[in-house]
């Protein structure tokens, strides 16, 4: 089994219901092709580095997928014709870091401890 990290960027005017539909749609494609979604992260609305199809922002969703390579072919074939998506990217990895949340904010407790430890207010 191969391990992949797959990120999709939806248009900024996509509703939360449509985002949920996109997530379910691509999850079903993975399961139909003998794969498994290990983890899903919703990174939310983020600024794009440059304007893509008249959008300055995009809604990012990230999947950690385990399965054969045909899953990625099928995903990318469907994503290429989806009008709600601006971009998609897949990276093959050797192992998953399930504890890392790429865009999560630090816990308030950690911030307070840091300030206390280094005498910063």
Swiss-Prot record:
Biological processes, Gene Ontology terms: translation
Keyword hit for rRNA-binding: yes
Alphabetized CDD domains for the sequence: bS6 (cd00473)
Alphabetic keyword roster: Ribonucleoprotein, Ribosomal protein, RNA-binding, rRNA-binding
Gene Ontology CC terms: cytosolic small ribosomal subunit
Gene3D superfamilies in UniProt: 3.30.70.60
Source organism superkingdom: Bacteria
Membrane-spanning residues: none
UniProt key word NADP: no
UniProt-listed SUPFAM superfamilies: Ribosomal protein S6 (SSF54995)
Annotated InterPro entries: Ribosomal_bS6, Ribosomal_bS6_sf, Ribosomal_S6_plastid/chlpt, Transl_elong_EF1B/ribsomal_bS6
Molecular-function annotations in GO: small ribosomal subunit rRNA binding; structural constituent of ribosome
Positions in coiled-coil regions: none
Protein family according to the UniProt entry: Belongs to the bacterial ribosomal protein bS6 family.
Known function: Binds together with bS18 to 16S ribosomal RNA.
PANTHER family in UniProt: MITOCHONDRIAL 28S RIBOSOMAL PROTEIN S6 (PTHR21011), SMALL RIBOSOMAL SUBUNIT PROTEIN BS6M (PTHR21011:SF1)
Annotated protein name in UniProt: Small ribosomal subunit protein bS6
Native species: Pelagibacter ubique (strain HTCC1062)
